[in-house]
Amino acid sequence: HGINFFTGVPDSLLKNFCGYIEDNVKKTSHIIAANEGNAIAIASGHYLATNKIPLVYMQNSGLGNAINPLLSLCDPDVYSIPMIILIGWRGEPGVKDEPQHVKQGKVQKELLDTLDIPYECISKDEKNINEKISKCVSLARKESRPVAILARKGTFEKYIIKNKNNSNNIMSREDAL
């Protein structure tokens, strides 16, 4: 789909996606952000510098951190910056999850609607995931706007990280302390 720049905040629902990116994308094309708003800003800078659509990944609870840069920077009414936002859908209605994710999951679609961010939902059982992703990328490119992909629990196949030392030089928790 022509996307070759990735930034975001890792999420348990996206761990297999993130592991694949970590192993298969150049370090300069994958930046783990401090928070989701920062990831939106990094992706915006990438687009402005290269005119290439980036992908931002996050857990749905992180969308709150991303609202300001999405509305004041990326929105079609402002600078019209296209990007794909891959969101791990924690707390999806009808899917067992931790209590802290229930409300965010319940309002996820309505929140994207309120923000006027078009979206598609994907899951491992669907036959047309590639079509949905193509539709999102085409819409982002055509309308020059953020478009979201909501990934349901279990969407991505298990991926074992091959190069465990390829961690963008991230310190372990113990090293940081």
Where are these regions (language model features)?
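Thiamine diphosphate
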Residues: 1-117, 121-177
